[in-house]
């Protein structure tokens, strides 16, 4: 009996270790500043260390200054090359009214769907009509695959019922698009 329990524990541990495609680390991401990593925005909203099988990475979301004429949201990935981190991905959204774009960190997905050792992700952004207290006009899902951005979104125009896709979305491999669209379709949207 003891042997069976030990075997199950060992098997479960090995299975979980092999299933782990990335390790999310906080390291210095909580106190990350522009002097640590040159992110594009004036203020950091969110940062997390994500180490996949091939590289150490930091995923940073930042925005332009509060009170600016428009709203700019940046999603960037910094990957370790040698002894330093370099920007390996950047995605930028703009809106004519400040504080109208909101990154939703608790609905993101990080995975290595194609098992190439590099993580893919889905980030969710709520786009409000005129600031954070106004109604949501669009929900955007930005898929990062091989350091390129692909978008899926729903709009208030049709009561958030139909998915729309960026022009390059069809270039995503089917397993990647299926994985993230399945996740996307399970999310509650306004």
Task: Put a short name on every predicted segment.
Residues 1-27:
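Bacterial Sec-dependent N-terminal signal peptides
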Residues 19-47, 137-140, 144-190:
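Acidic, small-residue rich beta-repeat scaffolds with periodic aromatic anchors
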Residues 41-56, 104-113:
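Beta-propeller blade termini
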Residues 53-62, 115-125:
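Acidic/hydrophobic-patterned starts of short beta strands in beta-sheet-rich repeat architectures
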Residues 60-69, 97-100, 129-136, 140-141:
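Short consensus segments that form the blades of beta-propeller domains
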Residues 66-94:
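Surface-exposed turn/loop modules enriched in turn-prone residues
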Residues 86-101, 158-172:
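Surface-exposed loop and turn segments in beta-propeller and other repeat-based domains
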Residues 109-119, 144-149:
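A short, structured loop/turn motif at beta-sheet edges
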